[in-house]
Amino acid sequence: MRVIFSISLLFTLLFSQVRVGEMKSITSSLDVQTLIGSGDDIILATRGGLAFYNINSGEYQVFTKDDGLSDTDLNTLLKGPKGYIWVGSDAGVQIWDINQKKLVDWFELDIEKVAEFVSYDDVVYGAIEQDGIWGIMEFIHTNDRIYYRDFYGRNDIGEIDDIVKFGDQLILSTDRGLLAGNPHETHPLYWTNPFPEIQTSIIALDQRNDELAIVTPDAIYSVKLGGNPVSLVTNEIEFNTIHTIAVAGPQDYTAVSDSVIYHIGNDKFEKQFSDAGYHFSSIFHYSSNILLGTSLGFALFDGTTFNHIAWGEPTVNSPDIIYLGQDKSMILASQKGISILKEQNWINASTVNYTLGLSTQIDLDYLNLNMGSRVSEIVENSDGSIYLGMQKSSSGGILLLDIKASIEIRDVFISPRLLQDKSGQYPLFTVNAMTFDKNGNLWVLSTNQEGKPLSVHYEDYSRNFSFEESGNLLSESMTAITKDNFNRVWVGAKSQLVMYKYTGDVYSPTDEIWVSEEINTGAFNSSVLCLNVSLNNRLWILTPAGLIYKDLQVSETNPVNQTGPKMTNSEIYPYFSNVAFDESSRIRFDPRGNIWITSQNGVHIVSENGEYWPDVNGLNESNSSILSDDVKDVAFDRDEGLAYIATNKGVSVIKIPFAEKKKTYNSVNIFPSPFRIPSSKPMTVDGLKDNSSIKIMTLSGEVLRTIPNSEVQGYQAYWDGRDQSGELVGTGVYLVAIYDNNGASSFEKMAVIRQ
C-alpha cells in the first residue's frame, strides 16, 4: 500500500502563509492506543491526534488541535450513533463528525480518564474517572444534539478497565471483578457480579454477536448470551501478560500481550506472532485480518503475515528538549530516542529495537544505548557537532552526534572524562547542564565524580574541578551553568552563584579567579533552577520564587553591577512569582532578546524592559491552541519568526513578532492572493523591515488607505480591504507601497475580489 498523503510536504506548507499569533501543531500519531475498522477506513486514536487510514488508497490523515480537537493525546474511541466518532482522553470526551471532518462537541466535566465507551439504544456510556471517582457517564442524543445526562460513580471501585454491552446489560471490568446491570432499570450502585463463579480479578474482556470472552489469571472463558461461563483453556502462565482480547467468532478469540499475538479456542492457546519491539496496544477484527495498534503505527495480520504500516513522522512525540541546528535541522530528544527533521524528512533513532517487517515509510535506526530518565541539554559546536546530555543513563553522560546524513554516535562521554558515581555494578551517569565557551571548550555539570561537579572538555583534553580548587565554592548541588559575554563561566546552586574566570589555557591556566555571588530573591527558597545570559550581558536566573536578573560588568572581583527587577521601594520582585517552576524549566531567548521561560503551566515571555507577551499569562491551553500546558523547551527560527514550543504532547509552532531584523524588502510576501472581501481575516504583508509603513493605492497613484508603523506588528502589516473612510474597495488590482523612516521602499501588486 502506498501512502499518498505526504506529511513532510504538509509540514513545509504549514507556515508559508501564517499571521503573527497563529499556531500550528507538529505531533506524531505513531503511538496508537486504540483502532477500529469502518468501511474502507481504519480509525486510530493516537498520542498525536485522531487518524484515518484508507485501506484502498493508502491516504492517511491526522486531525489535531489545528482541526478543532480539544486534546490530541487520545486513549480510546467508539463509532457511535449517527456515525459520530467518540474519542476519550484524560482531558475529556470529544465527538467527531467523520463526514464533515469537524468536532461536534466536547465535554470536559472534570474528567480525569476515559477507559472505554459503549453504545446502548442510541445512548453512549463511558467508563470514566471523574474527580477521583470511577463510574459510568451517560450521554444522549436529542434534537440532533448531544447532551451529558449524568455520572454514576461508585466510591468502592478503584478502577474500571473496560465496559461492554452484553444482551440488555452493561458489564464493567473493575478492580473488584465484574459488575453488571441494566442501566435503564438499575442504578450502577446496585450492580453485582453477573457470574458469581468467577471470583478472581479480570485481565481482559470483549463481546461480539452474543458471545463474551473473559480472561482471568486462571482461565479464559467463553460465555453465550443467557448461558454460564465455559473455560476454554486454563492455567497458562502467560495469561497474566495478556491485556486485550477480541472475539472473532464462537469460541474463536485473538488476544495480545505487550509483544505477542495469541490465537485462542477450545483447548487451544497458540502463539501466532512475537516481537518485543512493537508494543501492541489494541486489537480489532477487520474483514479477514486482525488490526493491531502498536507503539509504532499499526499492523494487519492475517494469521501468518505481519504487515506493518507506519509513516514519516517523529518517533519522539513527547520531547524533553528541542533544538534548531545551524543548518535549520530540528532535533527532538527524549529517553526514547532522537528524531530529526532534515530537508523535509524525519529521521529517527530509537532505543527500542524493531526487528521484524518494519515499514519502509519510516526512517528508523536502532540506538543501542540507554538514554536515561531525561535529556538535559543539547549544544552544538562551531563545526556542527551535536552534544546531548543525559540524566541517569547507564551508557554515559554525553552523546556526541553526527547528523549530517543520518544519526551517528561519534562518542559517548564516560569515565575518566565523566567519572562513575558510587551506584555499584551498574553506575548511572548524570549530566545536569552544558555550555560552550568562546574558545570551544565544553563545560559540564555532572554528579558522577564525588567532590568534582564541574568539568571542561576539548577533543581529548579534559579537566575536573574539585571543591578545594574553587575555595569550596563549588558543591554537589550545582545544577545550572552558562557563560557570559566576557567568557566567564557561571554555575548555580541552592543558595549562591559561582563565577569562574581563567587566563590562558584552561587545562593549565596562568591565572584563575573564583567569585561567589548571592542570589537575592528575598524568598526562602532561592535555589537556582536555570541560568542564561542575554546578548546584553544580563544574567537571567530562574528560581522557585520566579525570574530575576543581574547586569554584569567587566570587573572580575565585582562582576555584578545591579540586580533586578525591583519595586519602587528597591526590593527585588521576581517576574512570574506566582508560577510554579522546577528543575525541568528552561530559559531561552528569541531573536529580539525576549526571555521565554518554560513551565508545567505554559510558557511565559517577558522582554528585558519588563513587557509581557502576549500578556502576563504567556501562552497556555486557556488562551491559545498550544498542545499542552506542560512545556519542556522552546527553540526559534530566527529568520522566519517562528517559536517551536516542545510540550509533552508534541510541538506547537507559533508565528511571533520577534524575527531577526529584515535588512531589505526582498522577502516581502502578500497573502492571500487574490484577497477576497469581505473577509474575517485580513490581507497580510509579511517580511517588513522595522519601522515600516504601508499605503494601499490604485494603479493611478490614488492613496486609499495608510497603515502607519504604529499599527505594524513586528514584520507584518494587515489590511481589511477598506479605504480610509471605512468602505470596502472594489474588485481590481492595487499597489502596495512599503517604506521605512530611512527612505527604503518597495512596491508590490495585489488583486482584490469583492464578493
Per-segment meaning from a language model:
Residues 65, 709-742:
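Short, surface-exposed loop/turn motifs with a glycine/proline- and acidic-biased composition
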Residues 353, 710-711, 751:
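A generic structural motif
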